[in-house]
């Protein structure tokens, strides 16, 4: 469906996979950039913030923003042990869409897969990787 801030739906369309991030200091990639999460790492999800839908290092961010390190702990809070950013630009189109580690809960619009599958995917993705999210084969012609 159509994604917007708070909709908990994965955006339909074609999205560039811009960079990966996670708990470890580094990850095996095929050219895709990787960032290590630290205590100051936030994904800005407040649509009124001028840095909306971006990774920022801050001393503090309001509760509308996602403190990434909170999701690198032991299961089930381990989604961001390893993740890949799906670029979804536009104000109020939803924010923080990632391909990340699967746990016991449904996502809030992200795509979740097993940890080893995230690692394998990341090891094969380059800088020009995209993800296509459609409901059926016929919709592919729209992209």
What is the predicted function of each stretch?
Residues 113:
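A conserved hydrophobic position in a structured secondary element of the catalytic/binding core
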Residues 110:
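Short cysteine clusters
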